[in-house]
């Protein structure tokens, strides 16, 4: 990869992906795009940025062509809970945007990455140690979009020889940008509330285990996969990824190592709880580890320490300004 265009660059993943890619490949070699302008304090501000509605095929082609990109990272999407409330919009954005990105990739002979998700699994999927290849059958519009997206990526690889690469992300946890619209958001919100209020009310019930990963490991995984030897990659629809699996009570206990008085209660959101119940408790990542060296560095304990320290520092800086 030498010149990279990133869609959805202001999202939770996109923001940190832009920063890391600019560190590695050079600021001017990474074009960030999104449907809105970045905020004044956004780290995306320090390099090339263009407005892009990913459903606008002509505009996407224009940006790829004018920037002379050799790689496209398509991160723009409507997330799980938001997609469930707006299924038509979700289909139009998630599928229309992906088709435009794949067509741009095919037309301009790009390297291509787009994320799938554990949301691609459903009620009939094995819940524990979920295999790489298994029954999926999701029960949400977001999950349907992700399965269809996986199949499209595989189709473009087999039919047109397009270099498509993807991973099934678990819940991603970061202090840089607070998320919005996801079922796993509680696992980010809980840290901010612990520092700022000493209490959190979870919309996901106790005993609900979901796969998770610290954002640094997720960004590293994207770059490692994109730099991997093409000949070693046997999966083109989406590699299973996970670094840990936990429920809200486990996060509470990890936080109480640093905030002993932190408390947790529950006000379960039936929509997001239903989505979570349809997902695996834990997934098998052996294919990712074996084919391109996936090796996450953070577990719940080390991630908790970093999250709390980072939020404390962020609040200190904000209060001093």
Swiss-Prot record:
<dbReference type="InterPro" id="IPR036291">
    <property type="entry name" value="NAD(P)-bd_dom_sf"/>
</dbReference>
<dbReference type="GO" id="GO:0006567">
    <property type="term" value="P:threonine catabolic process"/>
</dbReference>
<dbReference type="Pfam" id="PF01370">
    <property type="entry name" value="Epimerase"/>
</dbReference>
<protein>
    <recommendedName>
        <fullName>Uncharacterized epimerase/dehydratase SAB0504</fullName>
    </recommendedName>
</protein>
<comment type="similarity">
    <text>Belongs to the NAD(P)-dependent epimerase/dehydratase family.</text>
</comment>
<dbReference type="InterPro" id="IPR051225">
    <property type="entry name" value="NAD(P)_epim/dehydratase"/>
</dbReference>
<dbReference type="InterPro" id="IPR001509">
    <property type="entry name" value="Epimerase_deHydtase"/>
</dbReference>
<dbReference type="GO" id="GO:0008743">
    <property type="term" value="F:L-threonine 3-dehydrogenase activity"/>
</dbReference>
């Amino acid at each position: 990869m030498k010149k990279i265009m990133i869609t959805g660059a202001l999202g939770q993943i996109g923001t940190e992906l832009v920063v890391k890619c600019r560190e590695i490949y050079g600021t001017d070699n990474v074009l960030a795009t999104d449907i809105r302008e970045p905020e004044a304090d956004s780290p995306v501000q320090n390099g090339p940025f263009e407005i892009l509605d990913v459903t606008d095929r002509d505009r996407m082609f224009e940006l790829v062509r004018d920037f002379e990109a050799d790689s496209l990272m398509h991160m723009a999407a409507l997330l799980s809970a938001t997609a469930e409330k707006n299924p038509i919009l979700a289909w139009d954005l998630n599928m229309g945007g992906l088709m435009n990105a794949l067509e741009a990739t095919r037309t301009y002979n790009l390297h291509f990455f787009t994320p799938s998700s554990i949301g691609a699994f459903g009620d009939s999927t094995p819940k524990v140690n979920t295999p790489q290849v298994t029954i999926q059958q999701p029960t949400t519009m977001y999950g349907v979009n992700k399965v269809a997206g996986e199949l499209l990526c595989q189709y473009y690889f087999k039919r047109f020889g397009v270099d498509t690469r993807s991973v099934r992300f678990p819940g991603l946890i970061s202090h840089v940008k607070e998320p919005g619209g996801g079922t796993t958001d509680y696992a980010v919100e809980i840290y901010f509330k612990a520092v700022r209020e000493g209490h959190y009310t979870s919309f996901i019930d106790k005993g609900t285990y979901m796969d998770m990963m610290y954002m640094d490991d997720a960004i590293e995984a994207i770059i490692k996969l994109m730099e991997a030897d093409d000949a070693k990659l046997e999966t083109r629809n989406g590699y299973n990824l996970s670094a840990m699996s936990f429920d809200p009570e486990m996060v509470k206990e990890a936080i109480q190592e640093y905030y002993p008085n932190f408390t947790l209660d529950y006000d379960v959101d039936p929509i997001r709880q239903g989505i979570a119940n349809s997902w695996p408790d834990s997934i098998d990542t052996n294919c990712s580890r074996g084919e391109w060296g996936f090796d996450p560095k953070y577990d719940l304990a080390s991630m908790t320490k970093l999250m709390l320290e980072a939020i404390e520092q962020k609040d200190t800086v904000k209060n001093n300004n």
